[in-house]
Amino acid sequence: MKLLTKVAAHCGVAFAALVAAVPASASLLPQSWNGYHWAHTGNLAIMLGNNVSATWTPYVTAAAAAWSTDKYIDYIPTAGSTTGSTCAAMYGTVQICSSNYGATNWLGWTTVWTSGTSIYQATIKLNDYYFNNAKYNNAAFRQQVACQEMGNALGLQDADRIYTNLNIGSCMDYSNDPSGTKGTNGTLSNVGISATDFSHLDDIYAVLDTTQLIYTKPGAFTNPQSVAGGVPEPSSWAMIVGGFGALGMAMRRRKPVTAVAFAG
């Protein structure tokens, strides 16, 4: 059986234009992805550039609206600044893309560019190579993956990585059945954000930083084309497809920094 798992590839960073204070407890938070977060002196309004197909748009829109109910963060939907196939990053924004990226072994791939632990741009790729297949071409998998990758882009790690246990009612939870209707993972749906997810996200963002990108300040920008380009120094989470028997697994690896964002 093909299962989903996730690979974290952490690359060293050299870009030092943005230096921000990291919450003192970040390294202790179970749902913090290496302490990565968007630096903020107040609330965040993060532009979400739409580079996805019409098929993906309702799922991306729903996930953005759901994450935007958090008390610290709003995703601001904007026109995309790239193409689905290229999915180039734009400084100060998250660009979300869909395309047929081929047999890469991943369904969704989130890349963040950081200075220290402060995120200054991110991309999300949704791989139609797999979503055009019957197993994944359904509303539950599409919504769960879009929701989870957008959570990762905020610095939130996954809630659970075991595919065969009961769903916990969170898009950050791995499952063979995110719909909760097939009798394999209980009856809870894993397509939305749980109260626990919001609690963990709020723990990450409860402590203010000393700086904030002007592009992420509420009301500052609504056009990603006005944002300057950044230097690629990516760190990535990938939701991959692989055969690991009856158990999902998580792996961590390191790769050298390259001149372009990598896709595994």
Locate predicted features:
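N-terminal secretory signal peptides that target proteins for export/translocation
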Residues: 1-6, 261-264
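Nucleotide phosphate-binding site architecture
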Residues: 232, 247-248
